[in-house]
């Protein structure tokens, strides 16, 4: 009976040791699976962050290019405004000159008429008599 009891205890210990080893293997398998899953998520997050960094850099470059283009447009617009102002100034100057020439022409015509009065109608053409 003692031998039988010792044998049963020994078998029970072997079964418990086997179950313990299986539990350890299962725990290691589970922890490996969890770590692999987490590593996959971390790798995905890292990849997403890299893509975001690339997009942010591209956005920054595009923004700088847009700012430069806008400055060029402003410079061109200012030049156009200045040219249009000069054209307006030339137009006003030419109208002033034209008006002055009309005044001079009218003054000369009146001076000529004052110095050379028109002939009476019957003396205008002596050959018609």
Curated annotation (Swiss-Prot):
**Mind listing the UniProt keywords for this protein, alphabetically?**
Cytoplasm, Mitochondrion
Keyword Heme included in the entry's annotation: no
InterPro entries tied to this protein: BLOC1S1
TM ranges are none
Q: Please provide an example of a Pfam family that matches this protein in its UniProt record.
A: GCN5L1
Q: Which GO terms describe its cellular component?
A: BLOC complex; BLOC-1 complex; cytosol; mitochondrial intermembrane space; mitochondrial matrix
Q: For this chain's UniProt record, which GO biological process terms are given?
A: endosomal transport; positive regulation of gut granule assembly
Where found, per UniProt? Mitochondrion intermembrane space; Mitochondrion matrix; Cytoplasm, Cytosol
Q: Give a yes or no for keyword Mitochondrion in this entry.
A: yes
Q: Where does the source fall among the domains of life?
A: Eukaryota
Q: Which protein family is it in? A: Belongs to the BLOC1S1 family.
Q: What does this protein do?
A: Component of the biogenesis of lysosome-related organelles complex-1 (BLOC-1), a complex involved in gut granule biogenesis. May negatively regulate aerobic respiration through mitochondrial protein lysine-acetylation.
Q: Give the quaternary structure.
A: Component of the biogenesis of lysosome-related organelles complex-1 (BLOC-1) composed at least of blos-1, blos-2, blos-4, dsbn-1, glo-2, mutd-1 and snpn-1. Interacts with glo-2.
Tell me what this protein is called.
Biogenesis of lysosome-related organelles complex 1 subunit 1
């Amino acid at each position: 009976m003692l031998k039988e009891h010792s044998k049963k205890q020994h078998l029970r210990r072997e079964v418990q040791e086997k179950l313990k080893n299986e539990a350890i293997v299962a725990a290691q398998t589970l922890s490996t699976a969890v770590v692999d899953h987490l590593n996959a998520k971390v790798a995905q997050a890292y990849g997403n962050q890299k893509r975001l960094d690339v997009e942010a850099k591209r956005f920054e470059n595009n923004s700088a290019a847009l700012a430069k283009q806008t400055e060029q447009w402003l410079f061109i617009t200012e030049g156009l405004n200045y040219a249009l102002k000069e054209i307006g100034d030339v137009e006003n100057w030419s109208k002033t000159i034209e008006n002055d020439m009309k005044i001079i022409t009218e003054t000369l015509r009146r001076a000529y008429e004052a110095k050379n009065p028109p002939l009476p109608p019957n003396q205008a053409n002596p050959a018609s008599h």
